[in-house]
């Protein structure tokens, strides 16, 4: 069974986000081994300097990279990523699994994004939209899209 992980910066703070993610975790059990790993978010002042932002991205990036599985296919969510359809995401998951890779790690950065080092590990740079969303909502949306991808691949009725 395929291992699918989300490695993200920060914790879900509101119960409604936690409940939404828990629902998709439950739904995904029949399709993959699903896990979410939260790495600590760096604290920054209200108006951080470029150097402070760069340092934050580097520290968070190191924490993320430590959690990427050996041989995993990495998909990083980033602003410059490619916008793809749900069907294309299903195809990425299928192609990765059929290619002999046993793990896909999806990466969600913190408020300032991802370090170049993290982005460079990615086989897919993915954008949810040209719009900006809170990272907590992006996590829920990604969980839903992963579930939808498995439904598409298996001919489930969830995707219309």
Task: Report residues per predicted region.
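Conserved beta-strand scaffold positions in the cores of enzyme catalytic domains, especially
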Residues: 36, 74-76, 125
């Amino acid at each position: 069974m395929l291992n699918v992980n989300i490695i993200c910066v920060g914790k879900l703070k509101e119960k409604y986000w936690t409940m939404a993610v828990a629902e998709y975790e439950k739904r995904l059990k029949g399709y993959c081994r699903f896990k979410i790993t939260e790495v600590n978010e760096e604290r920054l002042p209200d108006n951080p300097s470029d150097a402070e932002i760069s340092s934050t991205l580097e520290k968070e990036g190191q924490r993320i990279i430590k959690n990427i599985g050996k041989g995993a296919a990495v998909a990083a969510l980033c602003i410059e990523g490619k916008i793809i359809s749900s069907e294309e995401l299903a195809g990425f998951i299928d192609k990765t699994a059929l290619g002999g890779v046993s793990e896909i790690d999806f990466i969600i950065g913190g408020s300032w994004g991802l370090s170049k080092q993290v982005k460079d590990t990615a086989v897919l740079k993915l954008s949810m939209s040209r719009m900006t969303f809170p990272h907590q909502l992006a996590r829920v949306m990604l969980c839903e899209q992963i579930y939808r991808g498995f439904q598409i691949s298996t001919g489930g009725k969830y995707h219309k």
